[in-house]
Swiss-Prot record:
Disulfide bonds: none annotated. Coiled coil: none annotated. This is UPF0301 protein FTA_1286. One of its GO terms (cellular component) is cytosol. It comes from the Bacteria. Belongs to the UPF0301 (AlgH) family.
Length: 194
């Protein structure tokens, strides 16, 4: 039976292993309906930074704060790996290509938000991602039933946008009420050092 998980967090369980994309992934679900789901992995930083994006798109960044230039891009998923999107809190500004989500969040795929960021006009929280993850109709429901994903609606923006990527998966698990020990018990296996 279909259940809408839009604006919820997917946490990969230890059953997803040896998958370079989804092992220990934290996914924010931007869209979920009877036709499928679309989400962004938010804990897999890449070597590329916003400075690289600004240079590639010829966006002036001479006055951009250093910490913004060094901000990593995140691998949002395997689909359209060259498409950049910004997951961000709404800041009252209107961009050309913004989809408003729940909890005061939005996703924008137009250059105008990148120009604002380069000019230090920043949303309270933001995360630049390239690519996205998507599931066909019933695929996500089947994966959840197979215990590949833990779903939590306990959204915490500080954890969501935190840069402590090595512990973001564990932090989201704990915020959802799980511990590594409870996962070991739940899945009757040793998860090792998570």
């Amino acid at each position: 039976m279909y259940q809408n998980h839009k604006s919820e967090i997917l946490l990969a369980t230890p059953l997803i292993k040896d998958d370079i994309v989804f092992t220990k992934s934290v996914v924010y679900l931007c869209q979920n309906d009877r036709h499928g789901a679309m989400g962004l992995i938010i804990n897999k930083p890449l070597a590329d930074t916003l400075k690289d994006v600004f240079e590639e798109l010829h966006i002036s960044h001479t006055n951009t704060f250093k910490e913004i230039l060094e901000y990593p891009l995140y691998m949002g998923g395997p689909i359209s790996p060259h498409k950049i999107m910004i997951l961000h809190t709404t800041n009252g500004r209107n961009y050309t290509s913004t989809i408003k989500l729940d909890e005061g969040l939005a996703i924008t795929a137009s250059i105008d938000i990148l120009e604002d960021i380069a000019n230090n006009i920043l949303p309270e929280y933001f995360l630049p991602v390239v690519g996205y993850s998507c599931w066909t109709a019933n695929q996500l429901t089947d994966e959840i039933k197979s215990n590949d994903w833990i779903v939590t609606n306990k959204l915490n923006k500080k954890i969501l946008f935190n840069h402590e990527n090595k512990v973001k998966w564990q932090n989201h698990l704990e915020h959802a009420g799980y511990t590594l020990q409870s996962l070991d018990t739940l899945f009757n296996r040793n998860t090792g050092n998570c």
